[in-house]
Amino acid sequence: MTLWINGDWITGQGASRVKRNPVSGEVLWQGNDADAAQVGQACRAARAAFPRWARLSLAERQVVVERFAGLLERNKGELTAIIARETGKPRWEAATEVTAMINKIAISIKAYHVRTGEQRSEMPDGAASLRHRPHGVLAVFGPYNFPGHLPNGHIVPALLAGNTIIFKPSELTPWSGEAVMRLWQQAGLPPGVLNLVQGGRETGQALSALEDLDGLLFTGSANTGYQLHRQLSGQPEKILALEMGGNNPLIIDEVADIDAAVHLTIQSAFVTAGQRCTCARRLLLKSGAQGDAFLARLVAVSQRLTPGNWDDEPQPFIGGLISEQAAQQVVTAWQQLEAMGGRTLLAPRLLQSETSLLTPGIIEMTGVAGVPDEEVFGPLLRVWRYDSFEEAILMANNTRFGLSCGLVSPEREKFDQLLLEARAGIVNWNKPLTGAASTAPFGGIGASGNHRPSAWYAADYCAWPMASLESDSLTLPATLNPGLDFSDEVVR
């Protein structure tokens, strides 16, 4: 029984599904997808649970959410192993994901008060108040790269605001989704407040097509995000928050410490086997001897990165990709770039057949025309050389995406120029592209999102503002507008 609907664990009536470790092939999870009828059942359960959950005080909802944080802490080791085994991540990285889930609770509570709390301004004849109300029933679509942390960034703020939820994890990480839901069950959520439906495309389409849905919160690919945007077009009454990918540029302009810059680049491009939406996809490197030396060192160090299984010792920097198919797609993308005229500096290699262990790849594309503006979701870095900083900014902005951008340079003036001209929601200076502050919004523009950033701003799309003018009594104004006559004279 792998679906959780209205407080009960039930068996899916859709297609059967098996999840294997992407490196070893070990069977980790087996179950069935939710069919359309069960998706509808989950929506009805969420709708029925909404009035009572929304009427609870924030303090009462917060008790349940904080209880969940405690359960995450007590079950950190077990959840770390589940995420690592299912995604192929090394143990150390899965542990950082669970830690981020725990920290998200306190951050979301603080953000709720700052972004969507209550305000009251006294007026001569009363007061002006601002409150925020939950939307109702929200669907949350989770990604596979952070199957615990990223859905958590939608679910926690939505529950705090008083919404009820139908959660569909990625079909590639059903085990992690189920494990997290079992902790929410232990936290004491009332039946129907949070519901779990497993499945792939058909389940997702049934969920996004529900008429009785008040909103949809999505993290995933641009292609799927665009499909959801089209599907919900003409329905302005539904909130839609899209956090999608990027074709992110990292500008290496001037380097004082080559190894430090190489470390930053590897953290930006290859952490999580390149499966972060903020990963550097395009390395923009200044022409000249220093750039040549940096590039040679980057290739040499990247060549030593050997992917390993989640529990290998010593622990590897990167593990496998989410699937053998995903790894093969990266290899295919590299082959296509090479066929276009790209110069391979480091060829990505599948270490074994029927596995997702893929070594990083680096290919120079300077002077190659018609390079696709697409996100290759894996450890493949494309390199372009430039002559002037103005040219670098033009190259950085030459994308339909707009998620992250970074600069390595000792010159503050150049960073200030980049801040003014960059088209990206995250712009870092001498920091990895994959780093983000928990007290800042997370999202991009263009094909990277629809102006609904998550993280610190997630509270914004989980509630709507209600403004009020209030007075505890009603009296006739001393001065009336022209044309109003409240005298006792009888009109003849």
From Swiss-Prot:
PROSITE patterns: ALDEHYDE_DEHYDR_CYS, ALDEHYDE_DEHYDR_GLU. InterPro entries: Ald_DH/histidinol_DH, Ald_DH_C, Ald_DH_CS_CYS, Ald_DH_CS_GLU, Ald_DH_N, Aldehyde_DH_dom, SuccinylGlu_semiald_DH_AstD. Its EC number is 1.2.1.71. Keywords: Arginine metabolism, NAD, Oxidoreductase. It comes from the Bacteria. It catalyses: N-succinyl-L-glutamate 5-semialdehyde + NAD(+) + H2O = N-succinyl-L-glutamate + NADH + 2 H(+). NAD(+) binds at residues 220-225. The keyword Oxidoreductase applies. Transmembrane segments: none annotated. GO terms for biological process: arginine catabolic process to glutamate; arginine catabolic process to succinate. Pathway: Amino-acid degradation; L-arginine degradation via AST pathway; L-glutamate and succinate from L-arginine: step 4/5. Belongs to the aldehyde dehydrogenase family. AstD subfamily. Catalyzes the NAD-dependent reduction of succinylglutamate semialdehyde into succinylglutamate. This is N-succinylglutamate 5-semialdehyde dehydrogenase. It comes from Escherichia coli O139:H28 (strain E24377A / ETEC). The lineage of its organism: Bacteria, Pseudomonadati, Pseudomonadota, Gammaproteobacteria, Enterobacterales. The gene is astD.
